[in-house]
């Protein structure tokens, strides 16, 4: 896996410790930071994007039929990916950078299958106290049923879900269930967190799955900064 790190302004000269956003997959980092700067937002956090060896394999929790006829079936290696992230990459970051290592200051973001894995992580590791699933592939075969059977490992979670209003128009009969599945995931998480102090926020965006990805990340980051 390849990683790319963003450091906040003044990091090299200071002694302050910072919260960290880990991102499942590559993101348009320069564009996101430019939008934040243009909004007058000071990005006082570390951000590490993690490129997987295989998007479809590393960001699926179990095997499933191929998403499209021309693709191979996903191999369901998210457990191994999350183990590496939580047990190797995060400890390295905490040891070599001035992070705030506590889960409350540690977020996991992801888009599409990366967003699916951000939610899945809540049931597999307690390393992350915040998760953001942007246009997450929560339609994935059996995922809502998995959420209903299992429980998150933390009860103080803060969770952000977002979805484009046109995403359910997909011609793919599995993917066009995404709106119903995301709404169901929100219900499940809200019920599981109950009165424990955890919170779930769901935001609708304009457009389809690939519309304004930078803007959707900016919205999620600004939500996180407000609750951090």
Regions found by a protein language model. Name each.
Residues 115-124:
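Short glycine-enriched nucleophile-adjacent loop
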Residues 98-111, 131:
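Alpha/beta-hydrolase fold nucleophile elbow
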Residues 1-19:
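A domain-start/cap signature at the N-terminus of enzymes
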